Amino acid sequence: MGYFDYSREPKSDIAFVDMKSFYASVECVKRGLHPLKTSLCVMSRADNSTGLILASSPMFKKIFGKSNVGRAYDLPFDIKTRKFSYYNARKQGLPTDSDYVRYIEDWAQVTLVVPPRMDEYIAVNMEIQRIFQNYGSPDDIYPYSIDEGFIDLTSSLNYFIPDKSLSRKDKLDLLSARIQRDIWRQTGIYSTVGMSNANPLLGKLALDNEAKHTPTMRANWSYQDVEE
């Protein structure tokens, strides 16, 4: 494989920020509940067995093995009675022993199923955008979706982290941690950050492939991390 000279490539300091389970987290915070420890899903037509799951908390995903998109009838419990659904379990190849049934029913009883409130999500998103503007100019902030976007911190990195003994990679990590902290303090929402001292694409790849699985919820992919 030929050698690629990345020193000729443009470089920027990128923080690609994703709000963890955004809709579900907003609903948890509005109820004074911990967004990572509460079993909650946002469902259209929440009183109906055909309701569409629009978002779910990390705990909901862990317990019921469901992603953000699905139907109420795919759950291992009946949405109305909160009783174990043997039919759904067998259809999906899930266990039906008494311990598993009790486990699912116990969690089903405390699981919150709530309707979507887009006005709330937009309001929290605007609050997060204002936090971003504390660290970069509007021209350096690029919304990707309602719960995700990146900030080009190239021009502001040394201003916020002036320590000359630190590398730009270390500075980017410190500043990204500060952004995470501010989002959590002001909104109660946890965020994940894919960082790159190269370009937004590598920041996005770091976010999707590594940051979501690290204790700090941050990861950095730059040119030196790309195979030649």
Residue map of PLM features:
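Gly/Gly-Pro- and Ser/Thr-rich, intrinsically disordered tail segments characteristic of DNA damage-repair
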Residues: 1-228
